[in-house]
Amino acid sequence: MDQELMDFFDFSKEFVRKQAPRGHVSSNVHAFVTESDELEKPIKREIVGKDYVKSFVEKEKKRMNGIFSSDEMASRRNKSLDDMDSDEEYEASPEIRTDAEFYEKYYFNLNRDKSLPIYAKREEIINAINENPVVIVKGETGCGKTTQVPPILFWMMVSKAKQYCNIVVTQPRRIAAISIANRVCQERQWQPGTVCGYQVGLHRQLERFADTRLLYCTTGVLLNILVNNKTLTHYTHIVLDEVHERGQEMDFLLIVIRRLLATNSRHVKVILMSATINPRELSDYFANESSAPPVIAASYGRNFTVEKYYRDQLQSINWEGHQEDINSPGITQEGYRSAIKTILVIDNMERNERGTGKSYNQSLREGSILIFLPGVGEINNMSDMLKDMANHDPIMKFNMVRCHSLMTSEDQREIFQPSPPGYRKIIMATNVAESSITVPDVSYIIDFCLEKVLVTDTSTNFSSLRLAWASKTNCRQRAGRVGRLRNGRVYRMVTKSFYQRELSEYSVPEMLRSPLQNCVLKAKELKMGTPVEMLALALSPPNLSDICNTILMLKEVGALFPTMDGTYDPRDGDITYWGTIMSKLPLDTHLSRLIILGYVFNLVDEAIIIAAGLTVRGIYIDSARLGADNYWMHYVFADGSGSDLVGIWRVYLTYLNMCENGLQKDASIQWAKRFHLSLRALSEMHLLVQDLRLRCEKLSLLPLNFPTHRISDDREKAIMLKVIIAGSFYPNYFVQSKSTSGDDRNMFSVISGLDPCRTVYFTSFTDRTMGELYTRKVKQLFPEAQIPPENMDVTFGQGSEKIFVTFKNDIYKPEGTTYVHVPGRIKAEVYKALRLRTYCNQHSLRVMEPMNALKYVKDKKIGKIVEGRWIPPSKPVAVELLALPSLFDKIIIGRITNIVSCGKFFFQPESFENCIANMSEHFNNPQQLQNCVRNAGAITKGLMLLAKRQGKYQRATVVRVDTQDSRNVRFYVRFVDYGDIERLPMAQLRLMSQDLLRHYRDLPPRLFECRLALVQPASMVSTYNAWPQKADDMLHALAKGGRVQLEIYSLVQNVAAVMIHLREGNLNELLVKEKLARRTDEDYMSRVDHDFRMRKQECRGYVSQQERQQVNEEYLRSKQLPQDMDLSPPPPEECNSLITLKGPFSTLESRVFSTMRSGMSKTVRIDPCSVNFVLLDTEPQDQHAKMVVAASISAAGRHNDVLTLRSTSIMPNIPGFAAIMTLIFCPRAQLKANTANSRYVSILAGIGYHPQTMQSYYEDHDLVINLDVNIDEHDVLLINQIRYMIDSAFFNLEGELHPTAGHADRVLIHNTIYPALNRLLSKNRNFIECNPNSSDYVWQDMEESGEPDPQPYGRRSIFPMHTIPELHEEKMDTVLDLIANCKEMYDYRNFEGSFDPMTCSLCKQYLESVAELRLHLLTQLHLDREKEVGYPID
């Protein structure tokens, strides 16, 4: 590495600004500011069409016209590339090469399958190939073209003196390439991998690959070979099968073949084959001025008839409703009903044809019906309607089968199984059944003539699955599914005139509706013209604006440099080494970027697995339909990460472990069923992982295998995985926001002050219904979520229409249950309950009429009736006996008796020492210890007894029975006065006498629960949001020292938030200093209580002891939570009234908002199949913006105004994480300062702007991060160092093929990036006020605000250094104004008169009341700002 550059990043040296050379893009035009409402308007884009095509096509035609002279049309054959000495030799006519040794080595039986229609065309095909460079074969499915045409070529070459022959045949799908190659070998009696073999990806048969003369491969394999070799001359014949599918790879392959035919490969023969090809279009594409490729047609000639009917011909079904609209494709309810009527017509028709006279329910219903529907949603709708009809009419006997691309192997086998006698098999299928699956017993087809097409907006990269009318080609393909074994009928659910006049003949090619990144990269690799020039030569050229947008995206992901030969070009850019890698990986560019960053951060294998999992669809089985248990498996594998991508990685590791352990097939199937996984998809994923590993090995993308560079710690790996995920899917950044409007007060007021992390609620309950009678019924609303009733408390809002369900905070789970980690502090049961709402958002509850209920409780003597109002029974609480800290006590001294973590420990005030000693003496009296437990059945959950603790018996309650060892039964007990839980044998338990029970059963615990206040675990050292062991050890060491001094911050739900005093400072601050914790706000309830306690303690000296005691008892009484008495419900026969509850809901439910310009005004949702579909505020007390990253985004809605995020990941809850990730991984960024130029307040990121016009190059993908914590100049220096190191890993000089960095350099890069990143993410940052501005999305001239940093790699830098604007101290008069404003707020703190709303100038927050002002003064934001301006704090 350059020492000067390393010195630049040495932070031990003083940072001195120097005049540095300008970057390759400079700007000197003044910035402009747009109005804020301008940001809400859609971005105006210029759509440039296909006018650019004409000049390039004419030029190519001239090149094509010179391909073949009369002399070169002789039947002379090709020689191999190895025989050529130079490029100039390509133009010469090749010498004839024989291969007699090869033909003698293998058996060639080339005169078979004469019955196939293609055989009759053999001579015609041979003559056409001899006389033309390109031949088109159009043959119906089943005519034999795929398996017979290549052997015909062999026969032709054998007859020509056994000339050399090397044939390659492409297939659009890998399974087809493999199966057809094996079938040809079987037919010709060749050993697989010799004469005939296959290659899919990098996987190929290696038996005798040198002898392979007939290679079946995927389209992508041949395309890569040709792009790398830049010639066709490795082959004598190239056969492109299924050309009609018109995928991007096929269309670009046609471009490459036509160009190479016209330049250096004029003697190679090309055969294009398809069943539904447009021969005229292809013939014109390869034609020159003197000739055009001939078309040879081979028809199949069916033995059975296929009758076609249209909607207007089906008089018997009486279809009502509107006519079809070409602009509004879809299926109405009447359309579904008409399909069902058609099924009934088919049944009646079959009965009549057989003339059996059988009744409807006796009909055999032999022929299956195949219904073509556009998507899984429509399949579900059709299935539901058929089920409803079958339920209402038992004689309707249907055997319904689904068929779509995500179905499991078991579901696929079901398609081919015969139905039970008397049942009609109805297959509801998407277009996957057009060609991929043939079901022999299908006699009828119902075709809605619809399909779903994935279309991508190249300007935003948002994809949308659009409903569209199918082409006539598709419809004919569907009709071809019948008439093979018997006569068939096709019912098209459109009118005949609509079909004939409105439906297009062919589908829209993929190149016109999908991203073009891979095509552009192939064009750059091919080096035969610019991307615009090459794509202009496509069979269906894309719009110029789509190509330009693709160029911008490739610049954004690092595949292209911003400039071309040193100059910015909106239509081109020099390819980077990243782009070279991306062109060689069969992945989306963002997934390739994931692997590249995985290499940088030494997580390449994890990145490969995730990339493969995102490429292979359907790993989880139809999670939207199988219920909560299936969905919960996402959480099992995500393991608290909040990331679908981490879940994929863990699924694969589990699958791999299962395979390595040799699990039997049946056991594997059971494992997959249990976790709702598709073995077929996992197997496909495994093949892709192996392929990617091999490709990465060839590209030298290998992990560092030294122990010091391997990330072994799961916590560190989890953070780094999130880092590379954020880097890979830039700019798909979203900010999480609370759904509850207003401040934190609403979060608690809606649920009556209960814990939002454990509580859900239902609405639409009637207060007069006496809800406490139905608590058990409410608990039974969660069976599908598998939440046991004993694990929840049900309470009711006084005077409201809500039912609250609070899940118990017990760390001990019932036996047989698996603990599943979820993000943050929230209970897993909350996620389970909320997921239920997606399946059913209304729940019925049968209750009694109010008057009958009143009489019922009166007769049963349940509770009390006061003035006609029922008071439910409750357990009295003697608040004067509670050990909770008094309202007037700020400091309490005592002992910590038990520590679960820094977030949960138990404290025993020293004032109870004598009480504890007396109790212990009483309990350990020999007379009290005589009640030994002789029968384990006498010990039940919740029973109070005596249990041995540290040699003495203390009172305890039974938590649960440990039944693992039936011979030696043990019990988990909780020591009431110490807080710890122990597993004890029966011999160490004693039953309490009646005298002891009378005295101590109702005595509250002589301790209280605590947690550390104003801090939370630091994400960099925390797993599952748990406190790190080192922090817990520090607390343990403090507890062992004896008495400790607590400062009570607040008391909420009987848990005290405390600071633990040390000789200097307190433990809370020490944990922050040691980076084991970070500062955080307390939640609303805690701040309210703290404010109340402070004000009461301030006036303590003015209140008498008796009054203080009275106030404290009222205070403690108000702190007691509502009780669930678990009353028995009334008899069902008396519950005649029905209430429909809505929910459950949570006050922590969140929404996400886009940071991208193009997503600002759109509604954002998360995919229902994502682990984050139920998105909650996992740290409700934390006011920092939390970041969500999506691997892909789809758009829906009438104006594509609803975005759905797929494969999402919640980023670590680290303040400033979004800003740091943006600055590290964006192409360019501007840091914007506040008006005083004292701090950075926002980041604008994108690929940059035009230096003269100041217009953004890629406005749609510009994103803004508004800062809520301090990012300073030294942070940006660290970020620049990381960017430089990433660039260094891949930097290569112009013209070089490989990076210049060697192994030692890579070790240095790794050892530099990790510490720098750790410093950035673990830094304790001050909170700052938000400063949103109307010019946030406006690029500005930064020349006057700071010098640009040097660009070490100049224009060959993917991550150029960020300019660091110089900051200044705030002016003194501004500081004095802020101090005055702060003092004024403190003066108002105890004000009780009329209050005029005011603004906190430090935090830019509007305060409407004194109560709001008091709570604001307690926030970390305000406290940090006070320190910043030097406000004196008492």
UniProtKB/Swiss-Prot annotation:
Keywords: ATP-binding, Cytoplasm, Developmental protein, Differentiation, Helicase, Hydrolase, Meiosis, Nucleotide-binding, Oogenesis, RNA-mediated gene silencing, Spermatogenesis. One of its GO terms (biological process) is dorsal appendage formation. Its EC number is 3.6.4.13. The keyword Transferase does not apply. It is an enzyme of class 3 (hydrolase). Residues 356-527 form the Helicase C-terminal domain. Its main location: cytoplasm. It catalyses: ATP + H2O = ADP + phosphate + H(+). InterPro entries: DEAD/DEAH_box_helicase_dom (IPR011545), Helicase-assoc_dom (IPR007502), Helicase_ATP-bd (IPR014001), Helicase_C-like (IPR001650), P-loop_NTPase (IPR027417), SNase_OB-fold_sf (IPR035437), Tudor (IPR002999), Znf_C2H2_type (IPR013087). Residues 936-999 form the Tudor domain. Residues 126-295 form the Helicase ATP-binding domain. It is found in: Cytoplasm. CDD domains: SF2_C_RHA. A motif (DEAH box) lies at residues 241-244. ATP binds at residues 139-146. GO terms for cellular component: nucleus; P granule. SUPFAM superfamilies: P-loop containing nucleoside triphosphate hydrolases, Tudor/PWWP/MBT. GO terms for molecular function: ATP binding; ATP hydrolysis activity; RNA binding; RNA helicase activity. Probable ATP-binding RNA helicase which plays a central role during spermatogenesis and oogenesis by repressing transposable elements and preventing their mobilization, which is essential for the germline integrity. Acts via the piRNA metabolic process, which mediates the repression of transposable elements during meiosis by forming complexes composed of piRNAs and Piwi and govern the methylation and subsequent repression of transposons. Involved in the repression of LTR retrotransposon copia. Belongs to the DEAD box helicase family. DEAH subfamily. This is Probable ATP-dependent RNA helicase spindle-E. It comes from Drosophila persimilis. The gene is spn-E.
